[in-house]
Amino acid sequence: MMPECGTQCYLCDLPVRFDNYSGCSHACSYCFARHRIDISQISKKETSKALMNFISGARTKETNWCDWDIPLHWGGLSDPFQPCESKYRSSYKCLKIFADENYPFVVSTKGRIISDKEYLNLIKNCNCVVQISMVCNKYDVLEKGCPSFAERLKILESVSRVARRTIARVQPYMREVFLDVYKNLQLFKNAGAYGAIIEGMKFKRKKDGLVKVGGDFVYQYEDIKKDFLELKQKCHSIGLKIYAGENRIRSLGDSLTCCGVDGLSGFLTNTFNLNHILNGDKVLPSPRQKTDGTAGWF
């Protein structure tokens, strides 16, 4: 298997994801992937060889529109640094390739293994943005297979010392913990984060204060907008960037590229998508995107 496109390809600036594991042991009760597949069965998925093939220019029907070194989103559906990595060490092999090739990527994790010395030594030589998923300590009961919020703060601090950039990934955000998140922004800054990504929770059942968007129930626009703008004001007052991971409020963030790679050399994203077009950006397709037969995934 090769890196593949996610379902948000027509909206996302980094739509090509790489998952070297299938399944997850974090046991987060809110996980969206649990509604699609059985994530309790953990196994190796895409290989380091497949990663190297993509970096070398190989493409599939899903990715044949991409004719440049687009940054990969590593860990789109499964955490690369969950406990099974101690057994398989697949992510270590992939990190070595990323470091040797200086290929740009974003990786998302809640796992503690990323802060082990041998992994930090590789990350130090990688062209990457590391996102640590963390909301507040009240989520600890919802994330029973994960390091605690307090431990993840320490992980963020360790990774921030060596990574090119780190981001606190506040996803999924629930309005009940607004004050906790507001206070935690300073903790993220103190730990070395460059910014924070905020994305509201998607619910499967209707509740008061929710509206249906697509197949999910989400917070009403004015409610999530209000919270986001207050968090944005706080972020800017302490020197943090803020990004909106939710499509409806994307333009309220500091960049339409919500994963936190804005301004980094070597991170050429795909801006030829509805996100940029609807927000008034003048974007053009790449030469490959003009070729017949490459638009299927969009």
Language-model regions, residue ranges each:
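Conserved AdoMet/S-adenosylmethionine-binding subsite of the radical SAM
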Residues: 56-227, 234
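Glycine-rich anion/phosphate-binding loops
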Residues: 45-53, 111-112
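Canonical Radical SAM [4Fe-4S] cluster-binding loop centered on the CxxxCxxC motif
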Residues: 1-49
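Auxiliary Fe-S-binding modules of radical SAM enzymes
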Residues: 180-298
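Residue-level detection of beta-strand scaffold positions
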Residues: 15, 104-106, 239-243
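Short, glycine-/Ser/Thr-/acidic-enriched flexible segments
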Residues: 23, 79, 249
